[in-house]
Amino acid sequence: RESGYSYDYANPAANSLVPLTSGFGLPQANLYIKSNLSDGIYLNFELYLASRHHNETWVKGGFLQFEKMEFLPWDFVDEIMKYTTIKVGQFDVNYGDAHFRRSDGGLTFYNPFMENHIMDEFATEIGAEVDVHVGDFILVGAVTNGKLNNDLTKIDTTRAQTKYSNGVHNPAWIGKLAYDKQINSQFRLRASASGYYTAGSVRNTLFGGDRTGSNYYGVMYNAPISNANFTNGRFNPGFGDKVAAVMGNLFLKFSPVQGFSLESFTTLENAGGRGANEPDVRKSNQFVTDLVVRFGADEDFYVGARYNTMKADMGAAQGEPNHYEVDINRVAIAAGWYMTKNVMAKIEYVNQKYNGFPARSIQDGAEFNGLTLQGSIAF
């Protein structure tokens, strides 16, 4: 359950933003069902019961998960499956590690902050993924359809909207290598490198695949708040067709004594791509780092700070001859309390600034800041 939102903002651009006041956002809820179909075979089914973007219940995705394949008669398959997990269906794209800590509709329990990255790397796509665990190393390989909603329609490259498409619904290829180790009783390390590539999928949503909505309610819109205005505070670089992205993540946790720990999570990302109506590939990059201090008998409390900055090359604005570069910077300070293992509350102050946007844009010289309170239940 989410509650308590208040924002201030400044925008000297020609467009005026919708005035805001303090208030509550509607609750969001998710439902996860994991069914054991057979020994080592599971069906994972995920529903959004209610969200900002879709107020009604609808399916997020579902997939078969194989940890054993005893229906195959070969011993070597049993040996392989001791180290391997296979997923087939529609699932979260396993690009980077940031999606493990993001808020996803009603599931905000694992995010110590209120919001996700400015460039929010999240999509559900149809495909297959293989995870191999060998010692402290994890190797991930996947292929998907490269889009949220599948489309079998032949691509018409004579149309302006798809003029620069290669005319093919290309798959997306995802890879990850991670090292995750509890070095000793006090120190844990996880480092990973990931990549995502599609030669052209026309409707790719790697940076715009969330269908639930931001937790910064109402900011940065010049139209009345509705379920269509749900990406507040985020930025999509518009790589709807060709996409090549790489991400590095580093997680460190130091626990010198019982009931106290320091943890840090850092993301470095570089991406390039274009829409099907663009001739040139554009670039974007993002850097995010946070520090969280946990304390209390069972680390029931925490305080944290996050810095997020991104830059992106954008196509020429309407009426303008040249490309332009934008950057957005965010600072967030948060605190939280795990009242039980299933119930938590958190509060965050955020300040976000926009630079380099065209004069016709509501982001030109824009800034918002404010305080948000949120309650979360997971069971």
Predicted segments — roles?
Residues I118, Y164-S165, I362-Q363:
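Alpha-helix capping and helix-loop boundary segments enriched in small/acidic/polar residues
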Residues F122, A142, T162-H169, F235-A245:
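Short, contiguous, pocket-lining structural segments
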Residues H99-R102, T153-K154, R203-F207:
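Short aromatic-enriched loop/helix-cap "lid" or pocket-rim segments at secondary-structure transitions
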Residues N150-L152, F357:
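A short, polar/proline- and glycine-enriched secondary-structure boundary/capping micro-motif
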Residues R1-E2, A13-N149, G167-S185, R190, ...:
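Outer membrane beta-barrel
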Residues R1-P12, N227:
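Short alpha-helical hairpin
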Residues V18, F63-F66, F187-F379:
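Outer-membrane beta-barrel pore domains
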